[in-house]
Amino acid sequence: MREEAMKKQGVLVAPSIMGADLACIGREARNIEESGADLIHIDVMDGHFVPNITFGPGVVAAINRSTELFLEVHAMIYTPFEFVEAFVKAGADRIIVHFEAAENIKEIISYIQKCGVQAGVAFSPETSIEFVTSFIPLCDVILLMSVHPGFCGQKFIPDTIERIQFVKQAIQVLGREGSCLIEVDGGIDKESARACREAGADILVAASYFFEKDSINMKEKVLLLQGEEHGAK
């Protein structure tokens, strides 16, 4: 049922729970669901691959109990293989691992999929985008970091647009349109979202923009990120 949400036409919006009020994470998960967002992005950080430390399987399980939305774990950790089973048991519907985090990434992708969930690979901004080509036939999603991984509130890196275009073209050449999605994570707001959509992005991850307290409510922000310029009623 949750996987059907990934087949929806148009750009999917994935609020990152890292930007939420973590004192009431269950309520925030429900707020995301009520906003009309398509999935919840859960940033898992180990303090080694990136300097920040965030969530483990227990938090994923708590979010899973609070929502029916598709849950995506973005594993910014070394030795991701060791944690796959725990995150699957906690309720993850997709696990994304970093190209830079291990040498046996293709093995890890295969193992994630054998565990019955979707798999993806993330690429940091400084990593050559040409490495992506060999992963497109294997993955459900390619995630392009549009900031340096680790913290919310960073500015969108403009070079990401060319990287999206490269991946989009590679997906078309390899006949994987609709089977391998392009996800962009970092610095996403109304303006950068528009540029990403035009370049070919399928999923946009938003943290600071989505959760900041301002005059635009969450439902309106989802529509703006999707390209509905008039916002929600």
Swiss-Prot record:
<dbReference type="InterPro" id="IPR000056">
    <property type="entry name" value="Ribul_P_3_epim-like"/>
</dbReference>
<protein>
    <recommendedName>
        <fullName>Ribulose-phosphate 3-epimerase</fullName>
        <ecNumber>5.1.3.1</ecNumber>
    </recommendedName>
</protein>
<comment type="pathway">
    <text>Carbohydrate degradation.</text>
</comment>
<dbReference type="InterPro" id="IPR026019">
    <property type="entry name" value="Ribul_P_3_epim"/>
</dbReference>
<feature type="binding site">
    <location>
        <begin position="207"/>
        <end position="208"/>
    </location>
    <ligand>
        <name>substrate</name>
    </ligand>
</feature>
<keyword id="KW-0413">Isomerase</keyword>
<feature type="active site" description="Proton acceptor">
    <location>
        <position position="43"/>
    </location>
</feature>
<feature type="binding site">
    <location>
        <begin position="150"/>
        <end position="153"/>
    </location>
    <ligand>
        <name>substrate</name>
    </ligand>
</feature>
<dbReference type="GO" id="GO:0046872">
    <property type="term" value="F:metal ion binding"/>
</dbReference>
<dbReference type="GO" id="GO:0005975">
    <property type="term" value="P:carbohydrate metabolic process"/>
</dbReference>
<dbReference type="InterPro" id="IPR011060">
    <property type="entry name" value="RibuloseP-bd_barrel"/>
</dbReference>
<dbReference type="InterPro" id="IPR013785">
    <property type="entry name" value="Aldolase_TIM"/>
</dbReference>
<keyword id="KW-0479">Metal-binding</keyword>
<feature type="active site" description="Proton donor">
    <location>
        <position position="185"/>
    </location>
</feature>
<feature type="binding site">
    <location>
        <position position="74"/>
    </location>
    <ligand>
        <name>a divalent metal cation</name>
    </ligand>
</feature>
<feature type="binding site">
    <location>
        <position position="185"/>
    </location>
    <ligand>
        <name>a divalent metal cation</name>
    </ligand>
</feature>
<comment type="function">
    <text>Catalyzes the reversible epimerization of D-ribulose 5-phosphate to D-xylulose 5-phosphate.</text>
</comment>
<feature type="binding site">
    <location>
        <position position="74"/>
    </location>
    <ligand>
        <name>substrate</name>
    </ligand>
</feature>
<feature type="binding site">
    <location>
        <position position="16"/>
    </location>
    <ligand>
        <name>substrate</name>
    </ligand>
</feature>
<dbReference type="GO" id="GO:0004750">
    <property type="term" value="F:D-ribulose-phosphate 3-epimerase activity"/>
</dbReference>
<feature type="binding site">
    <location>
        <position position="43"/>
    </location>
    <ligand>
        <name>a divalent metal cation</name>
    </ligand>
</feature>
<dbReference type="GO" id="GO:0005829">
    <property type="term" value="C:cytosol"/>
</dbReference>
<dbReference type="GO" id="GO:0019323">
    <property type="term" value="P:pentose catabolic process"/>
</dbReference>
<dbReference type="GO" id="GO:0009052">
    <property type="term" value="P:pentose-phosphate shunt, non-oxidative branch"/>
</dbReference>
<feature type="binding site">
    <location>
        <position position="41"/>
    </location>
    <ligand>
        <name>a divalent metal cation</name>
    </ligand>
</feature>
<dbReference type="Pfam" id="PF00834">
    <property type="entry name" value="Ribul_P_3_epim"/>
</dbReference>
<keyword id="KW-0119">Carbohydrate metabolism</keyword>
<comment type="similarity">
    <text>Belongs to the ribulose-phosphate 3-epimerase family.</text>
</comment>
<feature type="binding site">
    <location>
        <begin position="185"/>
        <end position="187"/>
    </location>
    <ligand>
        <name>substrate</name>
    </ligand>
</feature>
